[in-house]
């Protein structure tokens, strides 16, 4: 029986605790965290075939420079329902002087802007909007997942007590990555939350053997840092 809220088309309040069984897949290199996150999501959806995945990378001409829009195109390639939310529809020219983006900025600017321009025609769902923690919790409560771009220099895992064996950047203490003043982009997969303790559960592709957890305040700081464009790729279970 449908509730009045469902009948009215209103979203139901999420549960107090969600922890989705998203498999952990470790990145192989310093640059492929986004691809590792995509593999996790596709495996969670039951759609990961290694051969098909490699063929998709070739067809989409993905290189070592992976942007969130690339991951959205990858989801579209596999017929996965998605919604890419960002604050910038294209490349922010202000990033040209940031060390993280500087090396390949000119060539990447043209490529990435073209992907944004062609998104609608290619049926890649892109939207310029602000996403709240409540929006994310509602999404996760329905069994869906999300790939989020964060500043790894800010992200802090409350569960990690040992250094990262392999990651994009040098670890320090309990942090998934060392805290540096410069932006360091990194993708993670959201898999749940605990409203009572105010934490977010996620998979960090730097690890092969654990789920990570951080406070909502730290997660918000990491995902809204300058350089992320607040990019979040919502992926739907009913794909």
Curated annotation (Swiss-Prot):
Gene name in the database record: Gucd1
Domain of life the protein comes from: Eukaryota
The name this protein goes by in its record: Protein GUCD1
InterPro entries per record: GUCD1 (IPR018616)
Organism the protein comes from: Mus musculus (Mouse)
Pfam families associated with the record: Guanylate_cyc_2
